[in-house]
Amino acid sequence: MSEKSREYYTIARDLMPGGVSSPVRAIQPYPFYTVRGSGSRIYTVDGTELIDCCGAYGPLILGHACKPVGDAISSALDDGWLYGTPTPAEIDLAQILIADHPSIEMVRFVTTGSEATMAAIRLARGYTGKSDIIKTEGGFHGAHDGVLVQAGSGCTTLGQPDSAGVLSDIVRHTRQVPYNDTESLISLVDKSGDEIAAMILEPVMGNIGPVLPKPGYLQEVRKITAEHDILLIFDEVITGYRVGIGGAQKLFGVTPDITTLGKIIGGGLPLSAFGGKRKIMELIAPAGPVYQAGTFSGNPLSLAAGVAALREIHARKGMYTLLDTATTVIGEACQGKGGSFVKLGSMFKFFFRSSVPENYAQAKESDTTKFRAFWEKMLEKGIFLPPSQFETNFLSAAHSDSDVEYLSSAYASCLSA
């Protein structure tokens, strides 16, 4: 894309594995390097302006450099940026999260989504006294050992759904079922339910698509897990505040036992959380025997950004309706283009397969060669999409009507070429 980016990548490959800090960023033959983001745009080292439909893989629902969030960060910086003590901002953000999620009565802040899901699983095991967990095939719940089994996101992009270095003694405690398949779930829990502490589930599979739940699927999962005394963990790191205030659990009317949140709740800074019923959460140290800790957990800068972002989201009445309308317009431009368009609110994707995928196996049938050619054409038109068939596209409140019109036109022309 630019000579400067090529030069940077040449240097970076000698300094960092693959030249990047996260695998999906290693766009071939070399990634472009970004120096600035503003609104719906990012800008490369050469000054190239791109309409951004990646949004840092989900956190930036308000767009880049949202002023109220930036102002909150600047104000917090004036007071120092790390104390190692509790802060009033922890209470502020906890109150917002609890008010917005009736399933959450207590919350613990951590730094990354991986930490949140790892701690949530540990908590479920500590609460139930059982050893095993269930995840869905292609479900991505971070980069810790117990969930790196047929994982989505960058694992699928690289063709490495199972990671080297993960011990078989660990993953044998991770059972898998296809998404949208309650019969397989029933069969598993009828046989092994006494060994299963929790099922961890992306209510909407954001890391292979999105792939949406079939009508009644989430409700049936809730019923099955409850009947077998299995905790239900909703991984809403992506869907939290993305599909609406209250997340997918509110949208679909399903109450999990534990929820993990991330991305949007930090306003673009590193912040995640997990929360749930009081009787479960009170097992977390120092209140209980399930240990979890972190130097940067609940750091003041991220909390300030998170409080500002969520207050701004609450203040923007109609934002989610506008975003839903925008992706509908883009979807209409994709009709009859030889693939399938999937959307939920501001999440969207064009799959290079004839019908909408309902699970991991079907999503993997997409033509990745066609996707790559399409992705390059869109980049030439000044549009940055996540560089994988298996990563969700995101719109933000900063995308204007003219942005949506341009995106729709580009989709139509690039899918026809």
Swiss-Prot record:
GO CC terms, sorted: cytoplasm
Organism: Methanospirillum hungatei JF-1 (strain ATCC 27890 / DSM 864 / NBRC 100397 / JF-1)
Molecular-function annotations in GO: glutamate-1-semialdehyde 2,1-aminomutase activity; pyridoxal phosphate binding; transaminase activity
Domain of life: Archaea
Pathway membership: Porphyrin-containing compound metabolism; protoporphyrin-IX biosynthesis; 5-aminolevulinate from L-glutamyl-tRNA(Glu): step 2/2
Reactions listed under catalytic activity: (S)-4-amino-5-oxopentanoate = 5-aminolevulinate
Full protein name: Glutamate-1-semialdehyde 2,1-aminomutase
Cofactor: pyridoxal 5'-phosphate
Top EC class of this enzyme: isomerase
